[in-house]
Amino acid sequence: MDIKKQYLQNEEYYHEIVDKKTIYLHHTAGSHRPDWVIASWERDKTGSGGVRHIATAYVIGGKSTRDGNTDFDGVIIECHPPEKWAHHLGIKANNNKRLNQESIGIEICNYGPLTKKGDEYFNYVNGKVPADQVVDLGYDFRGFRYYHAYTSAQIEATKNLVVKLGKDYTIDLSKGMQTLLNGPVLMPEGLDTLGQQKWLNMQGYIGGNGRALTEDGLAGGSTSNTNYAINSYKEALNGKAFELNKQALAGATGVWTHTNVRSDKTDLSPQPAVIEMIKSLGE
């Protein structure tokens, strides 16, 4: 597959090499140009003028909402080596750094949620989005029913890139969102605490500490790692794949979206093409 490179300056990302466990899908909340996204990260500074170290390893271009230009549609640009890292999640939790270190981020150029005014659709900067680039979810997701559509070329490029990264970094693509979308393996009935711990470990569930469960037969209190994993399993049964997820927040392996760790984000939105792409990973 064709992956272009437009590397950020050295100080814009961390050069520490970290084993990868997860892949996170984002959208940029911006225009179709991936090179412009990367250039904006170069300019992005703290209030005191320091480097922010905010980026994803990859950005995938889209289709212009102004003139329909497709020169960048599905174009993948790598802006730092995927084995290295930068901040892209922004979680207000003690494990934020670890989750960023252990993940590979992919941004898709897309404006995100849209507002309908009459028969027209507008993004958050009041730019008009053509009707043929709009998805009507049929229900509100995070307060919005209409979203800028991810293009077919973006979906294909995202899938190909995720599959490649899964192979390169031994990330199980059947974990994470695919488990939620396809439905989890059901826990056998009648298991005691030790049996539940063994089963949860076999299925890849982890405790709130980000580790496999200790198989000691002790349930512990309501905030124990065993109960954290059991509640994660119950959460998976509800099938809310694009909502906050306990396993994602703990650092469980697999493919996730930004919405799985941030309640204030809309990336990715649950568009049918995205759902089918994630469900098909590994096929």
Listing of model-derived features with the role each one plays in the protein:
Residues E16-I17, Q101, C109-E283:
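Basic/polar, cationic surfaces and motifs that engage anionic cell-wall
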Residues D2-L173:
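Active-site-adjacent loop/helix surface patches within enzyme catalytic domains
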